[in-house]
């Protein structure tokens, strides 16, 4: 579990909410429903609803799931590691060695998810 923040700057929940909804960044809504974003279209059903996620997972768990979901769930999870260099199959060569999100974006998402109680 990753207890310590990835950056020295505290996460910003408002920025995390934007990343969560942004189809070109976190794109969390593609797989997860979230009642806090009822105004957004097309909530996914692949992953669990994130309503009340802060009541189910501690901060360190949320950070670990975002960094590399396979460290918490099984290797078969379809959730990508957003701050991991571990890649799956059929990844474009120009993307190897790059993370999906930056460390501060992970911290912003953690701050936002911690508000979903």
Spell out what each predicted region is.
Residues 64-67, 82-117:
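C-terminal capping alpha-helices of c-type cytochrome domains
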Residues 72-77:
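Substrate-binding/catalytic groove segments of enzymes
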Residues 3-6, 49-52, 95-99:
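Second-shell loop/turn segments in exported
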Residues 19, 33-67, 78-92:
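Gly/Gly-Pro-rich "capping" loops immediately C-terminal to redox-active cysteine motifs
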Residues 1-23:
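Electrostatic cytochrome c docking/interface patches
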Residues 12, 58, 101-105:
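An acidic site on a long C-lobe helix of protein kinase domains
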Residues 16, 24-35, 62, 79, ...:
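The canonical Cys-X-X-Cys-His
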Residues 7-8, 40-41, 100:
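Short helix-capping and inter-helix turn/linker motifs at the boundaries of alpha-helical repeat units
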